[in-house]
């Protein structure tokens, strides 16, 4: 009887040690959400406001640039003269497909499939690089057509908005490649899939932001942009930013 009690105590002690180790590997906040995941959500929320401000400023400046063009004023090309919707649609499709491969990467590590993880992370990073290559080509094409960062207010707003998004994609690609390297060294176990999930949250956010940018920058016609831009300008004035 005493031996059975001792065995139960040992098992209970081992369970407590394992439970403590699990909490050490995955620290949780008071909300029950992993603290790293919570921090990522907070970062994405602040980044969402950042991009919202950039998009609103773009809408205002694009409307101003088009009005100056119609009045025979201003310098350099304006949106309807230079934006290539078919070409950018391909880039948008490439980035959207990278969200699918990111989901497959997470599913692979949750099944303990290290090779699948590396394959799909590599595919996601490759699609990100293709998107960045397309963005670089677009930037150089615009430059050769006379549109630069300081050419006019449209150029300034366009390159600032899309440039910051491109920087976010670049950070994401570097993150994905680092996960591949860690996986090759045996550092991403099945019970550490949260590391991949957090990277996936960031990557999906970058994709969603591009959908918004693509819709507002490339697809919405000038008269609609002017209306939205005027509303955004009025909003900035109401909160004291205009």
Model regions and ranges:
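...captures the hydrophobic TM-helix bundle architecture rather than a specific catalytic motif
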Residues: 1-242
């Amino acid at each position: 009887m005493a031996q059975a009690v001792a065995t139960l105590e040992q098992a209970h002690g081992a369970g407590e040690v394992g439970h403590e180790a699990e909490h050490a590997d995955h620290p949780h906040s008071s909300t029950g959400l992993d603290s790293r995941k919570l921090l990522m959500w907070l970062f994405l929320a602040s980044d969402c406001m950042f991009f919202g401000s950039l998009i609103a400023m773009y809408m205002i400046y694009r409307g101003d640039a088009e009005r100056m063009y119609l009045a025979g004023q201003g310098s350099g090309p304006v949106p309807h003269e230079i934006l290539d919707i078919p070409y950018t649609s391909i880039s948008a499709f490439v980035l959207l497909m990278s969200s699918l491969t990111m989901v497959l990467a997470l599913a692979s590590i949750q099944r303990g499939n290290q090779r699948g993880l590396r394959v799909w992370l590599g595919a996601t990073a490759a699609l990100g690089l293709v998107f960045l290559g397309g963005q670089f080509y677009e930037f150089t094409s615009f430059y050769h057509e006379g549109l630069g960062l300081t050419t006019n207010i449209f150029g300034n707003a366009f390159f600032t908005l899309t440039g910051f998004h491109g920087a976010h994609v670049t950070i994401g690609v570097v993150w994905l490649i680092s996960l591949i390297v860690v996986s090759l060294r045996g550092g991403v176990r099945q019970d550490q899939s949260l590391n991949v999930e957090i990277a996936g949250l960031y990557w999906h956010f970058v994709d969603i932001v591009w959908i918004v940018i693509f819709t507002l920058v490339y697809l919405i016609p000038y008269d609609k942009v002017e209306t939205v831009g005027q509303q955004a300008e009025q909003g900035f004035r109401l909160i004291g930013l205009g």
